[in-house]
Structure formats: structure tokens, C-alpha cells
């Protein structure tokens, strides 16, 4: 293996480059986070909430499916190639939004955004885990997610400001083309992590070669730890898909401006990103189980808080709490999966987990849209909050501590 060593400090240049790249990955989602639901209503005349949220459904399902295959593909052709392919596909997203003449073009652009995110974010995550020692995984994942969600938050604020100053479209999306080009160029300088992966695999006990089908079964239902984490991940992003789609409508109906909505919509992922700097490392010290369980309960409480207060400052507090609750679980999910899965099939197991987690975007938007159309937006938010509550109970009663 030559001079190849595991550990963040031993690979600080590559590790830092991957952090910067994931910042740009996050920019891609943040670009449309605060404004695309409103574009559907104002530019394309959508009156049904379900129709307006169809772009999140397309994003969620495409990202989920790509996550599943990205891990398997990366195990075969290497992480770097998958990363570059992801950026290449991402270039079409802002271009399609700019030229879109009908809503289906926006929906298709978000299919491509889901593919872009599934490939790029998965690879920056897996490569950091490859580089880190086993007792650094929570911290490594925390840094990765910190960078990504700070990117989401920053671009949500910037795009909201540009939309208020100029228009909802096309001005904010010119930045998207620049983001993709920079992300692709930075990724050219990445070195693949296959040698680091081989070192760790040699240190582990020999593992039977298992099929992709078996990895899917273990991660989805037969392994109590992996399957409990997968359900909690799905519940977390189901809540996020609902928040992404309904928060702009909820706050517009409360009389807030685009700028104010941009701030609230940005604070949530900003807190989500920032606090992962600490929660990932904390899980390396105190364990994964109770950090996940309590984080799920904080998310549920935060949604009910947002629902029942009616002051801008208190909505900001609610968004902050929602971000903290999500930060408690997000890096801990991936670290716990890495604790359980053998290096030889870890990326595949991570892909299955991320398949279920990110399908939550689609299920959340679908459920929220149906509930909002049948009842109202407030009822939709309140009912969706039950899922994180139940997931926390499942983690508390079914999952064992994975950090040993």
C-alpha cells in the first residue's frame, strides 16, 4: 500500500478538498429550496399543492434510486468516476429551469437534480468514510454534512434575495451553471480512495461475499440495527420533503415576505449543517443509539412548535430546533451504518440506507400534498410530525448500540 494511511490528519488535503466539493453539491439544492414551489404557483399557475410539490417527488425518487445503485457502481468503478458523472448530469439542471416552458420540464430537471445529488453527495460521503479511522467516522460524516447543508442554507438565502430583487426566474439559476462548472473542476483533482478501502478491509475479519439482494434485505428489514436506522432516515427526510414543499406556502399565508421566508428556510439547513460539526464527533464518544432517538423526538416537537406559534422570531426558533434535531441524527445514521457493515459491502449498504432515506423526500412531498389538499397545510405539517416521533420510539426499543 506504500505510504497510504487511514486517518483524517494523514489525508487532510484530500479530505479538505472533498469538504469544499460537498459545499458546492449543497449549493445545487439550496438554489431552488426557497423559490421553486412559488415558481410553480406564480409562473405556471399551479393551484393544487400536490401538483406544486411534484418536483420534490421526482427529485426524491430519482435521488433514492440513484443512491441505491451509486454504492454498487462505486464499489466496481471507483468513487471519483461516479463523482464526475454526477457533476456532468448536474449541468443540465439550471439550464432546463431557465428555459422551461411548462411545469413538466421543471419536474424533469429535478429528476436530473436527484441523480446529480445521489451521485455526488454519496461519493463525497463514502470517500470521507474511506479516509477516516473507525473512531473518526461520526466526525467525518459530520463535516461532510456540515459542508453540504451550509451550502444549502447559503444558496437558499442568496436565491431568495435575488428572487426578491430581480425575479424568481431566470436570474437565480444563472448561478447554477457556475456552481456545476466549479464543482466539476474541483473534482478533477480528487484522488480515488480504493487503496484506503483495501487497508481497512484487511484489518477486518474475513467476511463472506454477500449479494446485492442480501445487502438490501439486511439493511431494509432483517438486521435490526440497519433496518431501524433506515426507517429513521426515511422519517427524517419525509419530514424534510414536507418542509421543503409546504413551508413556503405556510409562511406566505402567514403574511411573510420572500426575504423572511428565505431566512427561515435557510436557518433550518444552516443549523442542520453547523451542529453536525459537533453531533458527529459526539456520537463517536457517547454512542449512536440515544443521539438518534432523541434527535427524532426533537424534530417532531419542532414541527408542532412551528405550527402553534405565530411570531416571526418564534418561527426562527422553531427552524433552529428543527435543524438541531436533524443534525443529531444525520451524521449518526451514516456512522452507525458504517459500524455495522463490512468495508467490502459498506458502500452498497450505505446506498440501500440512502435509498430509503431519500425516498422520504418523495413520500413526504406526496403525503404533504395530499393532506394539504384534503385538509389544509397546518394539518399536513402536524400529521407528518408523527412519523419522526414513531421512528424515535423504534430506535429506542429495537436498535442496539453499534459503537464498540
Task: Show where each model-derived region lies.
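Juxtamembrane intracellular "pre-TM" segments in multi-pass secondary transporters
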Residues: 1-12, 194-229
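Helix-loop boundary and gating motifs at the non-cytosolic
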Residues: 10-60, 225-228, 232, 236-254
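Residue-level signature of mid-helix packing/kink "hotspots" within the transmembrane helices
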Residues: 59-68, 152-153, 269-277, 361-362
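Helix-to-loop junctions at the C-terminal end of transmembrane segments
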Residues: 66-78, 163, 276-287, 372-373
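Structural signature of the two symmetry-related core transmembrane helices
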Residues: 81-95, 290-305
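Paired small-residue
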Residues: 93, 104-112, 302, 313-321
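Cytoplasmic helix-loop-helix junction between adjacent transmembrane helices
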Residues: 111-149, 335-336
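Symmetry-related core transmembrane helices of the 12-TM Major Facilitator Superfamily/SLC fold
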Residues: 171-188, 381-396
Amino acid at each position: 500500500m506504500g505510504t497510504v494511511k487511514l486517518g483524517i490528519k494523514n489525508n487532510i488535503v484530500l479530505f479538505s478538498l472533498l469538504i469544499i466539493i460537498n459545499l458546492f453539491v449543497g449549493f445545487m439544492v439550496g438554489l431552488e429550496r426557497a423559490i421553486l414551489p412559488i415558481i410553480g404557483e406564480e409562473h405556471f399557475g399551479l393551484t393544487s399543492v400536490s401538483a406544486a410539490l411534484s418536483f420534490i417527488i421526482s427529485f426524491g425518487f430519482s435521488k433514492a434510486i440513484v443512491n441505491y445503485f451509486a454504492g454498487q457502481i462505486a464499489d466496481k468503478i471507483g468513487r471519483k468516476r461516479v463523482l464526475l458523472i454526477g457533476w456532468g448530469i448536474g449541468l443540465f439542471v439550471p439550464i432546463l429551469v431557465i428555459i422551461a416552458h411548462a411545469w413538466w420540464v421543471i419536474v424533469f430537471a429535478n429528476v436530473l437534480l436527484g441523480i446529480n445529488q445521489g451521485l455526488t453527495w454519496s461519493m463525497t460521503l463514502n470517500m470521507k468514510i474511506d479516509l477516516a479511522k473507525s473512531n473518526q467516522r461520526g466526525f467525518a460524516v459530520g463535516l461532510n454534512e456540515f459542508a453540504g447543508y451550509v451550502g444549502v442554507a447559503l444558496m437558499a438565502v442568496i436565491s431568495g434575495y435575488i428572487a426578491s430583487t430581480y425575479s424568481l426566474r431566470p436570474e437565480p439559476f444563472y448561478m447554477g451553471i457556475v456552481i456545476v462548472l466549479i464543482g466539476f473542476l474541483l473534482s478533477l483533482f480528487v484522488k480515488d480512495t480504493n487503496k484506503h478501502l483495501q487497508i481497512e478491509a484487511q484489518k477486518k475479519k474475513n467476511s463472506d461475499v454477500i449479494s446485492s439482494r442480501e445487502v438490501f434485505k439486511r439493511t431494509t428489514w432483517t438486521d435490526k440495527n440497519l433496518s431501524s436506522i433506515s426507517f429513521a432516515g426515511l422519517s427524517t427526510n419525509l419530514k424534510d420533503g414536507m418542509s421543503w414543499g409546504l413551508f413556503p406556502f405556510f409562511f406566505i399565508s402567514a403574511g411573510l415576505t420572500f426575504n423572511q421566508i428565505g431566512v427561515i428556510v435557510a436557518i433550518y439547513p444552516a443549523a442542520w449543517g453547523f451542529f453536525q460539526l459537533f453531533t458527529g464527533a459526539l456520537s463517536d464518544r457517547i454512542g449512536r443509539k440515544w443521539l438518534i432517538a432523541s434527535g427524532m423526538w426533537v424534530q417532531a416537537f419542532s414541527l408542532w412548535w412551528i405550527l402553534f406559534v405565530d411570531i416571526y422570531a418564534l418561527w426562527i426558533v422553531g427552524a433552529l430546533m428543527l435543524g438541531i434535531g436533524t443534525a443529531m441524527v444525520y451524521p449518526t445514521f451514516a456512522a452507525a451504518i458504517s459500524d455495522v457493515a463490512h468495508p467490502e459491502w459498506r458502500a452498497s449498504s450505505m446506498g440501500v440506507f440512502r435509498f430509503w432515506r431519500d425516498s422520504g423526500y418523495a413520500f413526504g412531498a406526496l403525503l404533504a400534498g395530499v393532506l394539504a389538499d384534503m385538509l389544509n397545510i397546518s394539518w399536513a405539517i402536524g400529521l407528518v410530525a408523527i412519523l419522526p416521533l414513531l421512528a424515535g420510539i423504534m430506535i429506542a426499543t429495537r436498535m442496539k448500540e453499534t459503537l464498540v
